[in-house]
């Protein structure tokens, strides 16, 4: 099964997988670079890092993956959230993923610098608000995900609602995706969306014989 590319703003990931940002000092430059080198999007967990350490991690990731897509994941609830985002943008980070809260200010920072901002959401309402504020994409987390959760509902319930709510940005499902069957199940939620670039024949095969994909 050939997976479609993931387009976020001007970024194009050959493999539509974003590695989660696990704080503190778990998702570091080396993990992010390894994922980026395989065609996915690697994230450095910024929360809990001093600004100079974050700069070092971003620079190291760039050295290890010169052409890969490297982003940060930061918790909005963290005291130094704005400073972490500003520092990452100054270092030329490719995108900013933000969860554990919601910040309108981050969209202005992203717009000013041309950096894609990708909030983690748990409802169609917040996804719609995010798109209106300028989000380049949204990540949908349900109760299956780890970390700081905003709902007790399954992502499998929320994702179709978000897909219907937003108009022109990618929707990335997160949490509870453990194997190939889970990937197929999630992909089937996006079949009717215009941003899902998969041949109609492939879509039909997945619907009929998901166990063989």
Task: Describe each region flagged by the PLM.
Residues 23, 177-178:
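Catalytic metal-binding/acid-base residues of hydrolase active sites
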Residues 31, 145-148, 152-172, 178-213:
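Conserved active-site-proximal phosphate/metal-binding subdomains
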């Amino acid at each position: 099964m050939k997976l479609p590319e993931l387009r976020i703003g001007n970024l194009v990931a050959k493999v539509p997988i974003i590695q989660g940002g696990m704080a503190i000092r778990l998702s570091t430059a080396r993990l992010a670079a390894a994922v980026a080198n395989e065609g996915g999007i690697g994230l450095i967990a910024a929360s809990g890092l001093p600004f100079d350490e974050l700069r070092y991690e971003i620079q190291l990731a760039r050295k290890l993956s010169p052409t890969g897509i490297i982003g940060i994941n930061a918790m909005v609830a963290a005291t130094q959230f704005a400073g972490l985002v500003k520092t990452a943008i100054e270092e030329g980070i490719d995108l900013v993923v933000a969860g554990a809260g919601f910040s309108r200010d981050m969209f202005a920072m992203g717009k000013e610098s041309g950096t894609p901002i990708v909030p983690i959401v748990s409802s169609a309402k917040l996804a719609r608000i995010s798109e209106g504020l300028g989000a380049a994409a949204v990540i949908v987390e349900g109760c299956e995900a780890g970390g700081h959760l905003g709902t007790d509902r399954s992502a499998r319930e929320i994702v179709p609602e978000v897909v219907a709510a937003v108009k022109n940005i990618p929707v990335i499902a997160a949490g509870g995706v453990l194997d190939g069957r889970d990937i197929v199940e999630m992909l089937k939620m996006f079949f009717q969306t215009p941003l899902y670039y998969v041949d109609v024949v492939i879509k039909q095969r997945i619907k009929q014989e998901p166990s063989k994909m």
